[in-house]
Amino acid sequence: KRARNTLISLARAKGIDAQGTDMLIGTAGRFEWKNKGIDVFLEAMRRLGEKAKGKKQVVAFVMIPYLDREDFTMGNVHVVFVPTYLNGNDGVLNLPYYDLLIGLDLTVFPSYYEPWGYTPLESMAFHVPTITTSLSGYGVWCEEQGCTTIDKGVAVIYRNDSNTNDVINHIVNTIEYYLSLTPRKVAAARKAAVELALKAEWKNFFAYYREAYSIALKKASARL
C-alpha cells in the first residue's frame, strides 16, 4: 500500500488527479531508446489515450535514469517520467525500485533486443503481470512454458524488424483487455505471474548450467 500511495502522490504532485482506483503501469531499465522498447512504450501510451477516452484513468511511470522528458497526457492516460536511480535516496520517492514495483498493476517491457530480461521476470515475481516480446530470452522461455497471454501473468508479443506498429497496437489491446478484467480474474493473473516466475529460480536452472559447463570442459579437454 505504501508503494501505491507513493506513486499516486507523485502523480498528484505533477498535477494529475490520481485516485487509488486508477490503473498504474510502469516500465523501467537502462536508457536504451530502441533496445528497451522505450519508443514503443511511449507510442503505445499515446494510442491507448486516444482509444480509451472516457474509460478508467491510467497513470504510466517511466522509471528510467537520465530519460528526462516532459510528462504528457492523452485522454485518460498520463505519462510520468522518473529520470533517476531508484535506490531509496532520490529525494522524491525515496523508495528502492523493488519497493515501488509492488505498487503497480501492470508492467510493459517491449524489448527489441534482450538476451534474457530480468525486469519482466522480477515484475512477475512481485505479483505484477507483465508484457514483453519474443525478442527477449525471457519471453522465449515463457512461450516454451505455454504462457503468452496476460491471463497467465505474461503477454509475449511477437516482434521483428518490421512489425513495430503491430507491436504497439498489441500492447494497447492487451492493456485494454486487462482493464476489462474482473477483480477475480486480475487476482488469478497475478497468481499465475508469480507461479511462472518461481519456475525461473536459479535452483531450477542450475542443472542446465552444470550440463553446459560439463560440455565446455569436455570440448576444452579435447583440444589439449
Model-derived features with residue positions:
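Catalytic cores of carbohydrate-active enzymes across secretory and cytosolic contexts
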Residues: K1-L224
